[in-house]
Design a protein with these regions (language model features):
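Adenylate-forming
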Residues: 52, 86-115, 145-173, 193-195, ...
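Short Gly/Pro-enriched turn/cap motifs at secondary-structure boundaries
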Residues: 12-18, 70
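Active-site loops of AMP-binding adenylate-forming
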Residues: 1-12, 28-32, 59-62, 142
Length: 239
């Protein structure tokens, strides 16, 4: 345990304050714009102390990547020091992707913003370093998408959604474009930069659950599994 959250500091979005035995510091992650000079201070959370691991068992290369010579453990979490002295985890270094233009985007941040689109229930943003913008794979909100198609079905190539095969609906280019446009409208309203706007979207006809392997037991995205499953569709549509 490196941080604890006493009751008087408890609030959504914070992981608390360091325990007495632990030193903590934020280190600049220059490329993504996380600096200790930001207001509030931001950067990679680094920990040191007797309760912090010294390294990986019989894996010196991993240890060298994660632990500095003077004992700081580089967590890979991007943290923020709040005015009340608590810390919040706002990102993960591994979820920051450098695009072709050299700028980084934060996948989880984009997902949290775009989830408010009324036509989806889940989303995984994916970015290729050779692309100028990200793309997304989404699970549709079926009742809302069906309602849209009852209104605009003829225009979108689904004149009778009740008789249409749902897999075909999800693969329909015009339906995908309609969902993409709404996602980007949500993103624009939230202030996303042009390079953070989605280039394309794929619609999964299947719900993502821990049982089918697309989510962890904690409802986190299994990014590698989802990407592997949609590998051919991604190659065909992106970048």
């Amino acid at each position: 345990i490196s941080l604890v959250c006493p009751p008087w500091l408890a609030r959504p979005g914070t992981v608390g304050v360091p325990t007495p035995a632990v030193e903590i510091q934020l280190r600049d992650f220059e490329e993504a714009g996380y600096h200790v000079t930001n207001s509030p201070p931001q950067g990679e959370i680094c920990l040191r102390g007797p309760t912090i691991m010294r390294g990986y068992f019989k894996q010196p290369e991993l240890t060298k990547e994660a632990v500095t010579e003077d004992g700081w453990y580089l967590t890979g979490d991007i943290g923020q020091l709040n005015p009340d002295g608590t810390y919040s985890i706002i990102d993960r270094k591994k979820n920051l992707v450098k695009l072709q233009g050299g700028e980084y985007i934060a996948l989880e941040r984009l997902e949290s913003i775009l989830k408010s689109c009324s036509y989806i229930t889940n989303i995984m943003v994916h970015a290729d370093p050779n692309a100028n913008r990200p793309m997304a794979i989404v699970v549709p909100h079926e009742p809302n998408l069906r309602a849209l198609l009852k209104q605009r079905g003829a225009e979108l190539g689904v004149p009778d959604v009740d008789k249409a095969d749902w897999v075909d609906v999800c693969r329909n280019d015009k339906v995908r474009k309609a969902v993409l446009d709404d996602l980007n409208a949500v993103g624009k309203k939230a202030g996303l930069k042009p390079l953070e706007q989605l280039q394309t979207v794929l619609i999964s006809p299947e719900e993502w659950t821990p049982q089918n392997g697309y989510l962890t037991a904690a409802q986190k995205l299994q990014r590698k599994i989802i990407t592997k499953h949609f590998e051919q569709d991604i190659k065909a549509n992106y970048p």
